[in-house]
């Protein structure tokens, strides 16, 4: 019996997880590598050790516009992995935003804390260079799902021209940054509903984390997203400076002094896709190298899911 084709996937966000699940279900051997401490990518969550509070400091909600992701959302909702929140058709993940990605990757070979620094390919297949460990295996195919500039750097690490012709679209992708601020506060902040969207100024949105499904009884805590313009203007400032500035902006917005019991800022350099690659995925059939992500279809979790699934279908057909 022939061994199943070996596929390496770089990135354990929604696009990588979607591709991994499709390929694994089709009978291929999948290995996922991610530099983060946990899976999820920008569907990120952080648990404060002192308070035990969970903060979704990246993507906040999931929405479905097309049938494929709607079917997946319905299945997750039936199993308690997502639940309606904030507005009709909008879902939060339970217990945090990594849950859908963790579900897709369940039972698969996943390596976190592994930074892929280079790629090589010869007649035998693909090899990965890792910053933290050695990886001796040779893979039959390779899927890249990091933000487009990071994927482009990996492709550039190869011999000139290798696998590059089909990936010019990576240079079309553009992103806006976002500073995220996680706050635990003594009492619920005085704004109506679960999400505050001022419409102007440094703050794009404030999300009432303690009101999310599955967090009943949690102490008051919020996540604040700065506007793309403010984030770009302050991109290289220290987290401490950003914390102070955004806390002051929130206090001014609400007309009150805010004394958080916990605060932490996180910078997302590639937060929001503002220009796409112009295709559902990028693929070089001769090299068996593909790229998927929200950079292909737009700034939504659904776009990352659809892109990863579409690339997986194409790759599965080639490997069959």
Could you describe each region identified by the protein language model?
Residues 5-33:
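N-terminal Rossmann-like FAD-binding beta1-loop-alpha1 element of flavoenzymes
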Residues 44-83:
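N-terminal FAD cofactor-binding segment of flavoenzymes
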Residues 61-68, 82-105, 236-245:
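Short beta-strand to alpha-helix junction loop
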Residues 182-234, 241, 245, 249-254:
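Active-site substrate-recognition segment that forms the wall
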Residues 251-287:
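Flavin (FAD/FMN) cofactor-binding core of flavoprotein oxidoreductases
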